[in-house]
Amino acid sequence: KPTFKETISKEFGAELYTLAFDKKALDKINDWSYRKTNGCVPEILDELSPNAISVLMNALYFKGIWKDPFEKKYTKSGNFWNKGKQVFTKFMCQKMMEIDYYASEAEGVQLIELPYGNEAFSMVVVLPNEGVEINDCIQGLTAEKWQNWMGSAVNKKVNVELPKFKGEFTYEEKLKSALQSMGIKDLFNADKCDLSGIANNLLVSMIKQNTFIEVNEEGTEAAAVTGEEMIGSSGKKPIVIDFIANRPFFYGIKEKSTN
């Protein structure tokens, strides 16, 4: 409907296409994904059901340069441990980074916050202590706990060792079940779904999300050179904390004003 087209374009900057679900439509969808993600997610769909009525697509792309990039000359090889198994990989290393840090023995975690560029965004890396299962840590994470972590982190000098990594993730059934667990059920029920504000007789048949992330010395999916500021010290030996991410960790890209 014209009102829906106007709303999603004006309020969300979204694009709406009316297509026959054939090979040309599939190519158009994947071309959209390629363009919107700078080639990082070249294909969001590998097929379209001939019975499909609608498809909602969301491809995430983030490009950020560290405020203080890791120096490549300090990158080294080492072992990453996961459930007793080791993988030989590259670790970015930087001594005495002045970054926000939080640790809690009671919660069994430590975390760092690595700012990008002008600090509007940052990457938060959460490292469960040895012996703490990462899945337990993630499942126990609430909005309140996250806000407490962010509010309790303080600026420290930290020796950081973080593996370079690249990840590609696809969410389809898990995304649908997650929405249903939050109470969004009628959307997938032909007898109850009411999307008449979009079009008549419409039902959501699939929701799929593809994401891509690459973390290296320069930043997250970035290729740039950034200056580094040096400051003087009082001459006293500073207290330096070690953050060695050589075991499973989880991360999030955070927007500063909203946490």
What do the predicted segments below correspond to?
Residues 142:
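Catalytic and substrate-binding regions of extracellular carbohydrate-active enzymes
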Residues 85, 258-259:
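Residue-level signal for well-ordered, solvent-exposed loop/turn and beta-edge residues enriched
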Residues 1-131, 147, 151-236, 240:
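Non-catalytic, conformational "gating/processing" segments within enzyme and secreted inhibitor domains
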